[in-house]
Amino acid sequence: MSGNHTPSASGPFSALTPSIWPQEILAKYSQKEESSEQPELCYDEFGFRVDKEGSEPGCSQMTGSPLVEDPPQRLRWQAHLEFTHNHDVGDLTWDKIAVSLPRSEKLRSLVLAGIPHGMRPQLWMRLSGALQKKKNSELSYREIIKNSSNDETIAAKQIEKDLLRTMPSNACFANVNSIGVPRLRRVLRALAWLYPEIGYCQGTGMVAACLLLFLEEEDAFWMMCAIIEDLLPASYFSTTLLGVQTDQRVLRHLIVQYLPRLDKLLQEHDIELSLITLHWFLTAFASVVHIRLLLRIWDLFFYEGSLVLFQTTLGMLRLKEEELIQSENSASIFNTLSDIPAQMDDAELLLGEAMRLAGSLTDVAVETQRRKHLAYLIADQGQTLGTGTTTNLSQVVRRRTQRRKSGITSLLFGEDDLEALKAKNIKQTELVADLREAILRVARHFQCTDPKNCSVELTPDYSMESHQRDHENYVACLRSHRRRAKALLDFERHDDDELGFRKNDIITIISQKDEHCWVGELNGLRGWFPAKFVEVLDERSKEYSIAGDDSVTEGVTDLVRGTLCPALKALFEHGLKKPSLLGGACHPWLFIEEAAGREVERDFDSVYSRLVLCKTYRLDEDGKVLTPEELLYRAVQSVNVTHDAAHAQMDVKLRSLICVGLNEQVLHLWLEVLCSSLPTVEKWYQPWSFLRSPGWVQIKCELRVLCCFAFSLSQDWELPARREEEKQPLKEGVQDMLVKHHLFSWDIDG
């Protein structure tokens, strides 16, 4: 009868989980056996179509006897489970086995030797941590399916297009009526719903399809969750492919270390290995090696994580190293590299070579290289890539699924997402990426506009010593005794003792004895000029650059206010608690105001006296006497005074404050001040936010790069022009100065 057919031992479909057996095909097999006819299509024990030519790499190129469990191997596993749990396991009642297995060298040796195929579904769930996730999840798989069934997004449409492309040579996924297709659809849509920042990636489709061959649908889903959250670094499957791109650079570093001859060959022929191996990593070898070999690799992968991907790849390359070295040209090398996975037909040989060559490779070594090469990736490309804040870059965060808390805290600031407390948000990586890109764009603008900036080092200094030097450099910044000014308009020279100049010329000030007429020098000439025709430059610790002057170079305004400021605002908005009941205002500016005030109120009298002193005697122009905290407080107050009068929004205030910080070269120190105000940060931000994580230190290092450039940005650039200023021409009163010049003698030599 249809629906009750069972595969023959070691026959077609015998290695699959029973619920995915294709009953229609099994029924045809049964009829053919009774009539002694050969079936039209032949399938192996994994459901892959078999033909005379061997079909695809993932189908049946691996020769040997049918997949049969080794009884002694199964007994060793049973003995280990019984010993570990200190009770009689008997015929493996899995409900008595813990949801996770204690790690040990004995367990690792068993995994390396291979897991009995009949035990794989249960052991994979325990080794990977998927069973633990399944038990602890707030939402059941049924609820997730319900929530994702109507999710008509771009991801859902792309999933529909790829369903029949994922594994067309397998009977379970060959056509729209195949038994595995609706299962794959539900799993992929559930993943896209649960991880909205990832959505759908073709790599997940191939991995999920392979899992569905051996596990029930719900278990396959939780296995995918374990792969995404724990076994692979974040962004492996995101649109940026950040994690897998980083791992390709780590792989090249490991080849230098473990396979120096191959490294030399790749360099000589200028071969980009990642064009081949990125797909291997993205699918965890699901689409490139024979399914039998894949099972052995996955046994280790689910136990040890992404480390196995590097070890396996190095093992493959080592086995083919001699053949590669003997290749005649680049095309031959590239083709040989591409064909390596399909030529691997001995699991024991491959895994043995992988462990001999790279068995000493550790997670710590890989994570260290990941951090370093991720930074290189950012510096080289300057695109949407960013350095993670933890050793494994960051973890993917799920869609918020927690129930609301009760109490006044939830009423005022909404509920805390416990999943976000446990898993660091991949969004942090993307925020850093956007900021890094904005900083690089500003830096490239300076280097293109003003060549003297070309020698500036754009790679951030993440060392601990750099933070100690920050305040030393701030306190001991060079105070140039040379004062210079920028011409605001043209001044034509009529007499020998006058100094003529054109708009935006930089003039060295010789004397300011008279408040109206100053003496200056330009291009070797000295003379007097109207003081109101120039603007004194702030060059206490920097040298003026036209690239950073928004009155000369309009492009810097777009880069700072249009690119850098939004990137910084996004960082400050990440994890900002939002009032959900009262509808009150929630903006980073409010946090900055409170934090700046809190940092100076501890010594308010002293700070106030110093601010008055600076305002009265212009000490802040002649030399920095304010601490970063005091300077921040003063800048916030200054922005409020000028912008409130113009009824400016808080977004405008934030952008103007950032411009002040760039002018003063203290933007990175201000971030440290704000993040060090712990009571204020805890009041305004969620525990999983960027400002409450150690990641803010990395942002400080990124912002420090901007200190190498001299900005002269107008704080009030976005404010409407004042009518009083419009009514007073700049040249008004110059005639009086000319009269004064002819009535008195001027000492041009100062």
UniProtKB/Swiss-Prot annotation:
Molecular-function GO terms, alphabetical: GTPase activator activity; GTPase regulator activity; small GTPase binding
SMART domains: RUN, SH3, TBC
Location of the RUN domain: 555-718
Keywords in alphabetical order: Cell cycle, Coiled coil, Cytoplasm, Growth arrest, Phosphoprotein, SH3 domain
Sequence ranges assigned to domain Rab-GAP TBC in this UniProt record: 114-305
Residue positions, PTM Phosphoserine: S406
Disulfide-linked positions: none
Tissue expression: Widely expressed.
GO biological process, one term: regulation of cell cycle
Intracellular or extracellular location(s): Cytoplasm
Coiled-coil region: 415-439
Main localization (coarse): cytoplasm
Pfam families (UniProt xref): RabGAP-TBC (PF00566), RUN (PF02759), SH3_1 (PF00018)
Keyword Phosphoprotein: yes
GO cellular component, one term: cytosol
Domain SH3: 480-539
Free-text function comment from the UniProt entry: May play a cooperative role in NF2-mediated growth suppression of cells.
Assembly and binders: Interacts with GJA1. Interaction with GJA1 induces its degradation. Interacts via its RUN domain with the C-terminal region of NF2. Interacts with RAB3A, RAB4A, RAB5A, RAB8A, RAB11A, RAP1A, RAP1B, RAP2A, RAP2B and PDCD6I. No interaction with RAB27A.
Entry similarity comment: Belongs to the small G protein signaling modulator family.
Protein name in the entry: Small G protein signaling modulator 3
Organism of provenance: Mus musculus
